[in-house]
Amino acid sequence: MKVMKIGIVIADFYPEIASEMLSEAQNAAKEKGIKVVAVSKVVGAFDIPIALKRILERRDVNAAVVLGAVVQGETSHDEVVAYTSAEKILSLSLQYNKPVGYGVSGPRMTIAQAKARAKEFARRAVEAIFIRQS
């Protein structure tokens, strides 16, 4: 059986959350026998698509996982960032025909909520790359 190889893109705007998410995703991948061949850190969720594109272009990558937290502020900026980023991430997954596990929390989430859900979002993003055939 061929080993699945993935790349991870992590938005590091909230370093404490990002570190926890990355560690959890790497542990989940290891538990499932998945090899992480690339990790790309970007500043924020809006920057994820360009790093994801570079990872999906790699021939040695079968899938990818994107991680980060988009926290609500005083304006609707979090919604714009989250929705725009998610749309581009989905487009790249379809363009390269490779699954992308989406582990970006938000929008409309407090920093406390993002911290509390960091591990769950990361683990589920790794699980999401398995496309079930019916």
Protein language model features and the residues they cover:
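Glycine-rich phosphate/diphosphate-binding loop of Rossmann-like nucleotide-binding domains
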Residues: V3-K41
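Short, ordered loop/turn segments at secondary-structure junctions
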Residues: D12-F13, A69-V70, S105-R108
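Amphipathic, non-transmembrane alpha-helical secondary structure
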Residues: S23, F46-K53, E57, A116-K119, ...
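Short beta->alpha junction loops
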Residues: A38-F46, G106
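Glycine-rich phosphate-binding loop
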Residues: I50-K88
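C-terminal binding/interaction regions
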Residues: D78, S85-S134
